[in-house]
Amino acid sequence: MKNTKTVLILAAVTGALLLGGCGSEKTKTYEQAGKDLSQGSYKYALEEYQSSIQNGVKLAQSYRGAGIASLRLGKYEDAVNNFTEALNCDNVSKNLRKDILSYRATEELKWGKYEDAMADCQTLGEDFSMDASSYFLTGKVALAMDSYEEAASNFKQAYGEDATYDMAIQIYEAYLDKDMEADGTRYLEAALSS
């Protein structure tokens, strides 16, 4: 009887250690994916995030990571799908939701899905407080849609929130891409005169 209890306790402890080891290994894969993503190893990061998704590890964050890796690899449709899956996960924090929406809008812009990108920008404006990055992204999408006044308004807000040389360069480059260099030059001049 005493031996049976000992065997059962040892079996339970061994089982817990083995299961704990599996969870630890799954977490290590997720953490390695983050490292690979930050180091520019997008292919490896994508594979590791996909493994984390299959294992149910931090689903929203894993889908987000897979989306970013896909974005960097130029797999636009996959990126949008991953960002959408991330948004559909349970218990997505407000900050993470804003981050994912911003990434998805950026991806949709690159993919040429301007209406979808603008819809995400509008959701950002309705559900979250806008910051310089949000205004800039919305301006860039509006510019791509040839909504010049809306773009100008958003760029003005972006520069008002972040009147730095970097923001001026970003706005200038957005206008330059649309052959509207003169519109962007005023931001460069303002940054240089500060």
Briefly describe each language-model feature range:
Residues 27-28, 61, 95-99, 133, ...:
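Start-of-helix register in tetratricopeptide repeats
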Residues 57, 91, 129-130, 162-163:
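Short coil turns that delineate tetratricopeptide repeat
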